[in-house]
Amino acid sequence: MKILGLTGSIGMGKSTAAAMLRRLGVPVHDADATVHALFARGGKAVAAVDAAFPGVVRDGAVDRTALGAQVFGDGAALKRLEAIVHPLVRAAERDFLARHRRARTRLVVLDIPLLFETHGESRCDLVAVVSAPAFLQAARVLARPGMTRQRLDAVLAKQMPDGQKRRRADVVIPTGLGKGPALKRLKAVVAMMRGSRPAAPVGGDASKPPFY
């Protein structure tokens, strides 16, 4: 079974790329969705988060806004949260991979926002980085409810710069020109990893514009 790692900074279009891969028939393990499930009523992280951050659990689920207010700008608090969440996310990922190995699935995707930052590339056969011009990234993110420039800058400060991600990528997925070029590149990657076409040089180059 081949494993494609999918990552990209906030606002780059990673969720759209993951949805395209699902439509191409590739199973996707979404780390963010796993966190949402862990924080939901009955989720495996609720009790531990409640103990570490009193007052953030309401009606049996983690209130992400309240949690964010306690963690935002506090590096020590963030590390406490990560110590709770990351092992549970990895356990869910291992279950996903084991299930698809048993099913003899040929290709799966690990959708991980902080893939390089957490050294997740070591678990992947190939890493795809979703990228767009910085001005478009900012416009997308600032259009989200409750998002401010300060919050965006804080998120970006915790993420590897886009140029560095592209330099480390095996393939760059462009989203700056719309869905068409992104889908074309993803189809080529899927075909290559499934073995239905020869390998081709599809890597990124940080010295070039990210597919404007």
From Swiss-Prot:
Q: Does the keyword Transferase apply?
A: yes
The catalysed reaction is:
3'-dephospho-CoA + ATP = ADP + CoA + H(+)
Q: Where does ATP bind?
A: 11-16
Pfam families, sorted? CoaE
Name the enzyme group at the top EC level. Answer: transferase
To which pathway does this protein belong? Cofactor biosynthesis; coenzyme A biosynthesis; CoA from (R)-pantothenate: step 5/5
The record's Gene Ontology cellular component field reads: cytoplasm
| Signal peptide segment | none
What InterPro entries does the record tag this protein with? Depp_CoAkinase, P-loop_NTPase
Question: For the DPCK domain, which residue ranges apply?
Answer: 3-204
Show the GO MF annotations. ATP binding; dephospho-CoA kinase activity
Family (UniProt): Belongs to the CoaE family.
Annotated protein name in UniProt: Dephospho-CoA kinase
* Encoding gene, per UniProt annotation: coaE
